[in-house]
């Protein structure tokens, strides 16, 4: 699985510039990290699912970005980071591919990943018809305990909206948790970063453990008709946000191999659900 490594490699570049001229690796007001995470999930899912590759090759499945879904039951709406979908007949944006999206978001691939991407069928962007899978990615980078209620609510509202719109759709969640003991927050370092940086101190690994435990409380489902995510992954990173390389953490509190929240488990589960739920598509 390449997604987590692609994510930390890409986040190691400080190319999110704020209005004060500061360049950041992560900025809470940018959706860059979410799009990179979702790109990696789709990349790994394409590699893992023969049926999805066939559907893409046949031109049956496309992707959409920031797609608005509306919960029919409660009449609430939410923009989802990335969806896999059939194409609508309505006019929309010109088609763009997953490869082009990687260039647009500055996603950093190594030679092996580039070679594997080149072998995959071209997944194109299209106006969204029926949503097959909706991906939502969130991050908990600092002030962990204070951020948890909002993080939980944002992730919880995603699967509710997806399944309120169409119960057959696969709802996938991704959460990135920072385990760095100190952090340079863009919110606290606007004009003073170069001369007098203000560091946020974390009690680690306790703060990261609190976040991971809270995310584990999100509802999950094993069949349509139930409430919850169809698949959910937690990735732990070490990001100081000062320009130093971002690290991928594999030791606890990061989910271990075989854990249902491990990234590879999520990809395997998504591939299995897709194969059973959409075997007759097209």
Describe the residue ranges of each PLM region.
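C-terminal tail/extension regions appended to the core domain(s) of diverse proteins
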Residues: 1-64, 168, 179-282
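Active-site metal-binding core of divalent-cation-utilizing nuclease and nuclease-like domains
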Residues: 57-129
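Conserved catalytic cores of phosphodiester-cleaving nucleases, focusing on short active-site segments
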Residues: 82, 131-139, 155
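Eukaryotic short linear interaction motifs
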Residues: 91-92, 142-144, 180-184
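Short glycine-/polar-rich loops that comprise or flank the Walker A/P-loop
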Residues: 131, 167-171
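Short, conserved beta-strand edge motifs with alternating hydrophobic and charged residues
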Residues: 136, 170-177
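Surface-exposed cleft-lining segments at the edges of enzyme active sites
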Residues: 138-150
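Substrate-engagement module of ASCE P-loop NTPases
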Residues: 157-165
């Amino acid at each position: 699985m390449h997604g987590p490594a692609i994510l930390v490699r890409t986040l190691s570049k400080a190319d999110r510039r704020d209005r004060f001229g500061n360049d950041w690796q992560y900025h809470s007001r940018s959706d860059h990290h979410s799009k990179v995470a979702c790109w990696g999930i789709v990349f790994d899912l394409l590699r893992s699912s023969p049926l999805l590759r066939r559907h893409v090759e046949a031109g049956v499945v496309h992707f959409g970005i920031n797609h608005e879904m509306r919960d029919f039951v409660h009449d609430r709406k939410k923009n989802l980071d990335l969806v896999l979908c059939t194409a609508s007949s309505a006019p929309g944006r010109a088609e763009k591919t997953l490869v082009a999206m990687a260039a647009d978001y500055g996603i950093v691939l190594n030679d092996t990943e580039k070679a594997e991407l080149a072998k995959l069928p071209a997944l194109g962007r299209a106006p969204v018809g029926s949503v097959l899978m909706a991906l939502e990615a969130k991050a908990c980078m600092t002030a962990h305990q204070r951020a948890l209620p909002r993080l939980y609510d944002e992730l919880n509202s995603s699967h509710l909206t997806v399944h309120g719109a169409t119960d057959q759709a696969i709802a996938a969640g991704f959460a990135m948790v920072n385990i760095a003991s100190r952090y340079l927050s863009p919110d606290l370092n606007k004009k003073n970063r170069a001369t007098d940086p203000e560091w946020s101190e974390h009690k680690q690994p306790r703060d990261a453990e609190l976040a991971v435990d809270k995310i584990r409380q999100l509802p999950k489902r094993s069949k349509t008709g139930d409430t919850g995510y169809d698949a959910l992954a937690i990735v732990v990173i070490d990001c100081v946000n000062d320009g130093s390389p971002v690290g991928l953490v594999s030791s606890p509190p990061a989910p271990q191999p075989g854990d249902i929240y491990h990234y590879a488990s999520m990809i395997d589960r998504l591939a299995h659900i897709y194969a059973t739920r959409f075997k007759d598509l097209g």
